[in-house]
Amino acid sequence: VIMAEPAAGLLSNEDCQRYSSVYVKRIIDAVQDDSFAVILHNCGNTGHCTAAMLATGAKGYHFGNKADMITALRECPSDVWVMGNLDPVGVFRVLTPEDVFARTEELLTCTGEYANFIISTGCDTPPEVPFDNIQAFYLAVEKYNKGRCLSIPVAEVVSDGH
C-alpha cells in the first residue's frame, strides 16, 4: 500500500519526525511484514527530510519531482525501494511525447546503477495528461530495459520451491 504524507515535506526534518514519522512508523510496524509492504510517499520532501522518512521503516519511499533522485538513492539503504520522480505536470501534462520519452530515458540513465530504483511520476498524474505521453513513458522504460540483465534473486522469483 502507498501511504501519502505530502504535507510532512513542508516541515523541517525534525518536525517531520516529531509530527509525522513517529505516527507513520506505528502504522508501518503494525501492518508491514514479509508479505505486505508499505511505501511512503512524500512529494513535499525536497531532500531536507529524507532521514525522517527513513525513520518510519517503510519498505519503499516515493519522492516528488523536486527531490534529487541521485541524492535520495544515496541516502536510502539499498534494500528498500526508491521511487520517483518525473514531474506529472511539467513533464507528463505539458511536454510532447518525444520530450516525455527523452526525460524518462534521462532519469533511467542517471539512476541505472541503483537496483532499488523504480521510475514513476513524482506525484499524482492529472487527468488531462495526453495518453500519448503515458505511452511514451512506457516505451522509454521498455527500450531502456530491453536487453538488460536484471539481477533478481531466485528466492524472489520462485517461492515454496515451485
What do the PLM-derived regions correspond to, one by one?
Residues 1-162:
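Active-site loop segments of alpha/beta catalytic cores
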